Regions:
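Positively charged n-region of N-terminal signal peptides that target proteins for export
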Residues: 1-6
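Bacterial N-terminal signal peptides
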Residues: 7-19
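Sec/Tat signal peptide C-region and signal peptidase I cleavage site
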Residues: 21-25
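Sequence-level preference for short, compositionally simple segments enriched
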Residues: 26-327
Length: 327
């Protein structure tokens, strides 16, 4: 009888240890949900105030919910704001806006990198249902979104600007975009990070270049666009898919609908003659009036079905598979 009781006690203890959530996980001891509302109904009226109130390097994810409104502020997610999500009520009416640009900042040759409306330095960041815009206009470099963190996710967002709208920094950083809208003029998606764009609309507002990847030597992938719509404003006459900001740039368009008037050659070199030998530009199964594979420049590539099949989010993002990318 005593043996049976001891066995029962041990079994119950084992079950409790395995299946009971520790109190620290149920209540981490810090606030994990915040609301920002301009009418005062939330915890804060400004986004930056909410970010500054969060715990540094939290064990549990933190969510800041943004009520509808136009938030005119420069927002910075610091490196210690890891596992942070900013979730808007809806994309069209939840807007973060600012109007800095190169000459206004006036901090020397690198002023571009200070012009952001939203800058993300932290890892494991998520933005959803939000518009981020730089309203400086056609006055030179003016960044809307600047990302330096790793494993950053953007779902159902809009990024609006002119030159240099989206800057994806970090030589080993990985970013994932799904169902997003991005517009701009010159080089409006640029940087050295690895990024996957799924089912996004990419809209050129002038005759210019869509991408300017600066992939570093030795990195296997740069920007990959999958099943995206490439569109243009009505008065646009010619758009290039990209040009290499650095000589090892890598950009691929997979099964994209090229509705914009893409230049027949598709891609263009920068000033460096070595670009043609070291850059990797490719397409697979492009559709629409801008798809002219036989007229593309000789140093670009048309992928085979087998080659294209090797391009998956998990492979491109080196084993990181964000929830938004899962079927």
């Amino acid at each position: 009888m005593l043996y049976n009781r001891l066995f029962l006690v041990c079994a119950i203890s084992f079950w409790i240890a395995c299946f009971t959530v520790p109190a620290s996980a149920q209540n981490p001891g810090y606030q994990t949900e915040f609301t920002v509302a301009q009418d005062g109904s939330g915890d804060f009226t400004r986004i930056q105030e909410a970010i500054d109130a969060t715990k540094a390097f939290p064990d549990e994810p933190i969510t800041i919910r943004l009520k509808k409104g136009v938030y005119k502020e420069k927002v910075r997610v610091y490196s210690w704001n890891t596992k942070l999500s900013l979730i808007g009520e809806d994309r069209e009416n939840t807007v973060i806006t600012y109007d800095d640009y190169f000459d206004k900042i006036n901090l020397g040759r690198n002023s571009t990198f200070h012009t952001y409306t939203l800058q993300v330095e932290a890892n494991d960041f998520r933005l959803e249902n939000v518009t981020v815009e730089n309203t400086a206009g056609p006055v030179g470099q003016a960044v809307a979104l600047h990302v330096e963190g790793d494993r950053c996710v953007f779902v159902n967002c809009a990024f609006k600007g002119n030159q240099d709208t989206v800057y994806l920094a970090g030589e080993r950083s990985r970013d994932y975009f799904r169902n997003c809208y991005i517009d701009g003029t010159t080089d409006f998606i640029f940087g050295e990070a690895t990024a996957w764009f799924e089912a996004c609309e990419i809209r050129a507002k002038s005759d210019s270049y869509i991408t300017a990847a600066s992939t570093v030597e030795g990195r296997p992938y740069g920007f990959v666009f999958h099943e995206c719509d490439i569109t243009a404003a009505p008065d646009v006459k010619q758009v290039y898919l990209g040009r290499p900001w650095r000589q090892f740039a890598r950009t691929v368009f997979l099964e994209c609908n090229l509705q914009a008037p893409i230049a027949p050659e598709g891609w263009k070199a920068w000033s460096n003659k070595d670009d043609k030998q070291t850059t990797f530009y490719a397409e697979y199964a492009s559709q629409g009036p801008g798809a002219q594979p036989k007229q593309r420049i000789a140093w670009s590539h048309q992928l085979s079905k087998a080659d294209a099949a090797a391009y998956t989010p998990e492979k491109i993002l080196e084993g990181w598979m964000p929830e938004a990318a899962k079927p």
